[in-house]
Amino acid sequence: MTSPAQHASQHDPVRDYLDRGIKNYWYPVAPSWQVSNAPVGITRLSEQIVLWRDQDGKVHALEDRCPHRGARLSLGWNLGGSVACWYHGIEVDGSGTVNKVPAVANCPLEGTKCVKSYPVEEKAGAIFLWFGDDAHPEPAPLNLPVELVADEYAHFLCMSNWKCNYQYAIDN
């Protein structure tokens, strides 16, 4: 006989699939003003992500996980084109490649792409990320409605955080 507590903790692959969202689409993940000099940690479609701007103002997005010990990169430092982990200072660039491991000379991690990166577009006051699957890593063009990008229209970004499944938010 199975107790209710054991039954409730079973893995549900369908629920996990639904929580990860519809893949191969651009999603607005943050307003542009939210990402400035310090790295910002967000969770979207069940994925933890770090966002930061480089020295030219371009936004980068990586999985929020240091390849060395799994610490959150969003708690680290913005070095311009890369972010440094707060734990041991591992430097990871916007492509997910480890640039430097300060504590280990000639570390085998250096020059290796160890962290998932996301294609980023910044348009209409929002930061969009491409959530592609393994079969579609290259993003489709991000084509927004003319009302959001043309100068003859006024627009503003309205943001609200809902603690719910993305499916309910899309419907409303």
Question: Where are the regions that the model predicts?
Answer:
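Rieske [2Fe-2S] iron-sulfur-binding subdomain
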Residues: 1-58, 74, 92-172
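Local cysteine-cluster metal-coordination motifs and their immediate loop/turn environment
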Residues: 60-74, 80-93
